[in-house]
Amino acid sequence: MTIKSVLFDFSGTLFRAEPTESWLRAVLRDADLTLPEGELTEAADALEAVGALPGGGVAPRLPEGSEDLWRRRDQSAEGHRAMYTAISRQVRLPDARLHDALYERHMLPAAWGPYPDTAEVLDALCERGVAVGVVSNIGWDLRPVFREHGLDRYVGAYVLSYEHGIQKPDPRLFATACDALGIAPEDTLMVGDDRRADGGAAALGCAVHFVDHLPAARRPEGLRPVLDLVG
């Protein structure tokens, strides 16, 4: 197999979300609200425990009766927002409007940072003539994140679940990305952190490689093996 294109997941693969405490601090600052340090830490820990930060890598604690919404959350912007604000609202905050503000914050480029080797690997792939796509289960437009961090120039196609009404592991989402890049699935490598969701590319005939969803400091070179797989 000759790899001619690589599809990447977004969160936990190319980018990592900011820590939950930083997420909460930013929203409180923007709202001109102050909490005593102990209360702020307690609230951040509670948000972390329920998995309120989308893409934060923590399995969520779902509100009762929300299982169906959880299963289809990435198929629409409305569903994604409704699910994650419902998760967040399990934690008491000093102003109820902060839950929507937290959701808005997580969509900002400032809330995300690329892994240390992301730019290096994307640049090397482009130098080798390998096409790059991003396939993400998500409820909002992540393109500004790539632009803000100077990585948009490497990406030939973005295939986002909410824009297509289908989500990984549905092979149709990966097929859409392959079609957009003009590369056959059997010449494509999918790279992601979710064994079930990203592993769905295998049903289409793509090779699949997994990385660990870890804080950036603990995964400085997690993407570099992709270059060896491409050859």
Each language-model region and where it sits:
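N-terminal helical cap/lid subdomain that shapes the substrate entry/recognition surface
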Residues: 3-116, 143
